[in-house]
């Protein structure tokens, strides 16, 4: 490093000869006053050249402040014109190429002309001479005293000013020099400091400095008040802490306890009595220890207290004792629900195994069936029969995974998931836990709740279920989980695989009648404040309500209509009518209005091209009519009725089969030439799809092509292949119930579905004739009036263009009844 020797500082009264032209050094973020000594770091090439020029002459250099601090290449317009002539007292070249100079301000100057710009700025200056101040001026003397006193006061308030400066200030007698010295030491903004430098009159400049000192005094006063308030608050908190500690010590000496200590001791006892697993108990005591060390008002203290409350309230070791009396359990199940034998048998099997083997995992069941068949209420009965607590949570519309697993404790307002909340609500670790509407779970950017349920419903994993909030394992293996769904198709495969699925079919008319007599009518009479003295509802009236006012697989609408009848009777009783009201089929319309549904399928006669099919929907079975007609055309096939792709393909397959067997049906191979076929399924606003309408489509086409009428009392279901084989279908019981509601006498089913008849109650089978079909000819033999069909008058062509006559007494399906119908 190269160093230039020191130059002695000039005294204030020392004569100075300043040349007119000097090298210019632009400075940033500082204003240099006369007689001010400060170091400057010089790094720009143009500035280093200016320093070199000054050192090569008389060490004098002109310092002007830049208007913009970030300007790396300042122009003449970017610098203030009023600056300070300075002497370079010392120069040191640094290893990084920069130069450090120590300068002393000498006199103010005004730039009148920029002479050169390279290799360094050179300027012509005019020295600024300040006017003299009379020594006898009392006003000036008073101002100087006021300024000195103000400076002393702000230093006492904490303003950083060196003691040497204070000594110099006290001995100064010149107002201009006093103003410059104070301005250079109180940390003014660059704009304010430059404005002071440009004031030539010393007294005016000192007055401006006094204004800045007053402003600084006010700011420091406010700062002191803020700091005092903060210290006072901190001191108050510390004082409270010491007093609280002293109070605790005094209470301990007296054998007393403060409320917080008593609360923490109760929490400690609760943890000891909660029968937690060792790992959980260790964590609980650890968090309790943290809570004891915290100030009660600390933000984390509230969160820890809530966490520990959850820990002690969870039923870690609390369980209800199972009632293993199988006969009593059977009695309770029969009291609450009529029929549903399959589910009752499964519950009794569980109790029997539990009786023989004490330790076993809780079953995970899934009840699938239409709305209103008793899935949810069955869970309550199971809990009552087993002597367990019952918890139900609805999963319909749940889209956030945190609803199942909970939120992590770091979030404000975090809580455990609904599984842990349900167990706390139950107060035991082995309740009957119902997950209602499992098929209506959603998923979005917050996660997939169905995936979170995988751990809950897996017997191999749920003994170590970890909720995000608790973050400790909880044993769910003793819980008996029961899920409910309207359709199993929408439940994800991995979740479905973990459950034992039990199908609940819709109720028959006889079952509905029995349930209404045993449960619905007594319940509605009680809810509406009437008794058997005021109302009697006959069995036939109930049958009328079932047939003409409700069309459902379950019982909700039936109970609603019975409730409507009871309310109308209750009103009359309340008005003073003392009669005993007897509800008969003839008087039902008086209370419920005109019949909403007319039995389907009641046609006057057998018709050509109209076939009764059977469909399955999530709300039960439905009757599905298929119509086919032939007309002159170009051999086209038209399909209407909002049919799905599978159903359209069934029509194509049926037509291909008929064409392959045209000779047997007395049809020419080109029987489609010159004719169009139109297949329609009524209720066109409702989407329909599924493979099991194949035999229905084939029968309608054969009837339309051969002009052989279809029997009106025959319904059918089954899938067809190109070889004419009839394949099995699902939902047989629901379809048979729909056929019975429609007055059908004969039902044609696939031969491979004969095994399913064992699960259908005998009283249902007695109402219809069931015919099994292996091939489509078996179906046609039952459905058509004559089979094989006779040869038509015009051999080889369709028998005639048949337009199906209108059916009488057929009500349009209610809105939504066939939504998503699967044939």
From Swiss-Prot:
<keyword id="KW-0378">Hydrolase</keyword>
<comment type="function">
    <text>ATP-dependent serine protease that mediates the selective degradation of mutant and abnormal proteins as well as certain short-lived regulatory proteins. Required for cellular homeostasis and for survival from DNA damage and developmental changes induced by stress. Degrades polypeptides processively to yield small peptide fragments that are 5 to 10 amino acids long. Binds to DNA in a double-stranded, site-specific manner.</text>
</comment>
<keyword id="KW-0067">ATP-binding</keyword>
<dbReference type="Pfam" id="PF00004">
    <property type="entry name" value="AAA"/>
</dbReference>
<dbReference type="GO" id="GO:0034605">
    <property type="term" value="P:cellular response to heat"/>
</dbReference>
<dbReference type="InterPro" id="IPR020568">
    <property type="entry name" value="Ribosomal_Su5_D2-typ_SF"/>
</dbReference>
<dbReference type="InterPro" id="IPR004815">
    <property type="entry name" value="Lon_bac/euk-typ"/>
</dbReference>
<feature type="domain" description="Lon proteolytic">
    <location>
        <begin position="605"/>
        <end position="786"/>
    </location>
</feature>
<dbReference type="InterPro" id="IPR003111">
    <property type="entry name" value="Lon_prtase_N"/>
</dbReference>
<feature type="active site">
    <location>
        <position position="692"/>
    </location>
</feature>
<dbReference type="GO" id="GO:0004252">
    <property type="term" value="F:serine-type endopeptidase activity"/>
</dbReference>
<dbReference type="GO" id="GO:0043565">
    <property type="term" value="F:sequence-specific DNA binding"/>
</dbReference>
<comment type="subunit">
    <text>Homohexamer. Organized in a ring with a central cavity.</text>
</comment>
<dbReference type="InterPro" id="IPR008268">
    <property type="entry name" value="Peptidase_S16_AS"/>
</dbReference>
<keyword id="KW-0720">Serine protease</keyword>
<dbReference type="InterPro" id="IPR054594">
    <property type="entry name" value="Lon_lid"/>
</dbReference>
<keyword id="KW-0963">Cytoplasm</keyword>
<dbReference type="InterPro" id="IPR008269">
    <property type="entry name" value="Lon_proteolytic"/>
</dbReference>
<dbReference type="Pfam" id="PF05362">
    <property type="entry name" value="Lon_C"/>
</dbReference>
<dbReference type="InterPro" id="IPR003593">
    <property type="entry name" value="AAA+_ATPase"/>
</dbReference>
<dbReference type="GO" id="GO:0016887">
    <property type="term" value="F:ATP hydrolysis activity"/>
</dbReference>
<dbReference type="GO" id="GO:0004176">
    <property type="term" value="F:ATP-dependent peptidase activity"/>
</dbReference>
<keyword id="KW-0346">Stress response</keyword>
<dbReference type="Pfam" id="PF22667">
    <property type="entry name" value="Lon_lid"/>
</dbReference>
<dbReference type="InterPro" id="IPR003959">
    <property type="entry name" value="ATPase_AAA_core"/>
</dbReference>
<dbReference type="InterPro" id="IPR027543">
    <property type="entry name" value="Lon_bac"/>
</dbReference>
<feature type="binding site">
    <location>
        <begin position="369"/>
        <end position="376"/>
    </location>
    <ligand>
        <name>ATP</name>
    </ligand>
</feature>
<dbReference type="InterPro" id="IPR014721">
    <property type="entry name" value="Ribsml_uS5_D2-typ_fold_subgr"/>
</dbReference>
<dbReference type="GO" id="GO:0005524">
    <property type="term" value="F:ATP binding"/>
</dbReference>
<dbReference type="InterPro" id="IPR027417">
    <property type="entry name" value="P-loop_NTPase"/>
</dbReference>
<feature type="region of interest" description="Disordered">
    <location>
        <begin position="788"/>
        <end position="823"/>
    </location>
</feature>
<keyword id="KW-0547">Nucleotide-binding</keyword>
<keyword id="KW-0645">Protease</keyword>
<protein>
    <recommendedName>
        <fullName>Lon protease</fullName>
        <ecNumber>3.4.21.53</ecNumber>
    </recommendedName>
</protein>
<dbReference type="InterPro" id="IPR015947">
    <property type="entry name" value="PUA-like_sf"/>
</dbReference>
<dbReference type="GO" id="GO:0005737">
    <property type="term" value="C:cytoplasm"/>
</dbReference>
<feature type="active site">
    <location>
        <position position="735"/>
    </location>
</feature>
<dbReference type="InterPro" id="IPR046336">
    <property type="entry name" value="Lon_prtase_N_sf"/>
</dbReference>
<dbReference type="InterPro" id="IPR027065">
    <property type="entry name" value="Lon_Prtase"/>
</dbReference>
<dbReference type="GO" id="GO:0006515">
    <property type="term" value="P:protein quality control for misfolded or incompletely synthesized proteins"/>
</dbReference>
<feature type="domain" description="Lon N-terminal">
    <location>
        <begin position="22"/>
        <end position="217"/>
    </location>
</feature>
<dbReference type="Pfam" id="PF02190">
    <property type="entry name" value="LON_substr_bdg"/>
</dbReference>
